[in-house]
Amino acid sequence: MELPSLIRSLTLIDDRRNNKNKRYPLPLLLLIAFCASISKHDSWYTMQDYALAHEASIRELYKQLFGEELEHVTPSHDTLNRALQVIPHKVFKEAYQNWIANLLQWDEQTRQICIDGKTMRGVKKLSPDTESHIVSAYDPHLQLVLSMDAVPVKGNELDAIRRLLDELDVTDALITIDAIGCQHDVAEQVLEAGGDYVLQVKGNQPTLLQELEDSFPNISKGYTVNKEEGLEHGRIEHRQMKSVVLSPEMLDDSYAFKDWAGIKSIHRITRKRYDKRQGKETTEMSYYISSIEDSKRIFRAIRDHWKIENQLHYMLDVYLGEDGWSKRAGGGGHKHGAHGQNRSFHPTASKSKARQVDSTSADVLSQTQSSATLRTGAIVRIMRQPWCVCPFKRTCKRK
């Protein structure tokens, strides 16, 4: 199957500039911004340097993609700034949605959406009221960000979770959320949308947590156990999950479980970690409720939920330096943060950034066919980055 070109999708963006002084076409500016950004150039100045360093390659690539040979392909940092900052970030998001909509194929047996938040610390330091906390919906199997929402502080994360569930197509998906999402209305919202849930239970639901802590020691039969062992970062970790499918008796008025919509099973995970260096062993327990009974799927889903930290948040911090981003013109920090996950647009105009040029994006985009579509290998390398944004329910169709 021929895959659509990401770069061609960007040409759907309207050029909002005045008809005068259009020396550089908008697709060229977008192409330079995209190539430079995935090579970790996050200022207008380093983008200008990137275009100068790869002038011949950019000219040839533009000709392959758009069938036009340009005389000038090295815009100044001011030109890039003025042309791209006036475009709303939602327009960029829609361009990615149009591109990825044709690529997705859901597996209804394993489909999972992890929801979690991350604070952009550089933005928060400038203003406590800035929308610095980004809540993301992430597919750990496709390794794609499905959507995101920005809120001022972590305390508002629950509102963002509700909005994400409302705009995403969660049909047949297993939604995993940490304790902040363990709310009655969240569970109901997931079920009404055609999905299922696995919610972690902590102190924000004291009655439910106490019920779980009291129930498991008294359960001597009718339960299943899933185990796993691993060695990571010098620690040996044993994970064991004890699962119980709720009987009709456990859903009567004498138990707190009856108040949770669609609840079918409860789970306790015991994690024992042995630090080889320090010679210390620690044990912790965590509790979960779910609207499905398949304990093996739940055990794997809880484990995969951590991929939003390991694959997305870690990538944003370590490789893309998200915590160093600050408030910017043309929409503020949350606007840039939302596109830190597609990492292509609205970079800072700070001169303090070192001007470094590399050829990462040139290597990726050199795999371009004459038909102006990216090769499968290049598409996979691009779509598996945390800056990709996936379609909302109105455009995301399972195939």
What residue ranges belong to the model's regions?
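An anionic, glycine-rich sequence signature occurring as long contiguous blocks
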Residues: 202-303
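Short, surface-exposed basic-aromatic patches at helix termini and helix-loop junctions that form
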Residues: 187-195
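Short, flexible loop/turn motifs enriched in small residues
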Residues: 125-133, 281-283
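Membrane-interface transmembrane-helix boundary segments in multi-pass integral membrane proteins
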Residues: 329-340
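Short amphipathic alpha-helical "interface-anchor" segments enriched in bulky aromatics
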Residues: 292-327
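Active-site beta-loop-alpha junctions of metal-dependent nucleic acid enzymes
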Residues: 149-167
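Short, conserved catalytic/metal-binding motifs centered on acidic residues
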Residues: 32, 47, 76, 113-118, ...
